[in-house]
Amino acid sequence: IHLPNIEYAIKRNLSRFNYLMQEGYAVILPIYLSTYERIDDLKSDYPNESEEYKDHVIKWGKDYKRAIDYIVSRDDMDASNLTYHGASWGGFMANTLLAIDDRVTSAVLYVGGLCFQKSKKEVEAYHYTSRVTMPVLMLNGKFDQFFPLESAQIPMFKLMGTPENDKRHYISETGHFVPRETLIKEHLAWLRKYETN
């Protein structure tokens, strides 16, 4: 189940998931509020203290849970191996989403972290991070300008409630990206490591 960065949330481009589909994995792209044809008046995906932002986080959580409900209802999908993949905004939202539903069994977070911007307490991401307990792989750039290593990536990694031996923080000598070859190699290895069947 995927939550994209906001740039990709406007246009669909499934080719970036070819490496997963070629290995037999299903890729689920829920149509979250404010993405694809559900674009609305939300001014920014950055956290803020408005009621509008709080309401959006709650609705994104509902969209996420509905997507999981759908996967679980299907006989042709293995819901026991459900993995979350979040990219940028999706890596940040993982702080909240992974904490609100325990049916996801592992996660790969691509260039995510905690944000500096404050939001209402009910949806403040760091309040949820310690409730993330499944295996998590974080793939980040050392020089990321959106999620800096020392102030966004490392705090998120340390706050997660995942046992130390089930979480990994891969740091590339890059900015707000990790080379595609690295993403593919690390992502597939993580999926294989935590498959239950």
Predicted regions: what they are:
Residues 44-88:
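Gly/Ser-rich "nucleophile elbow"/oxyanion-hole loop immediately N-terminal to the catalytic nucleophile
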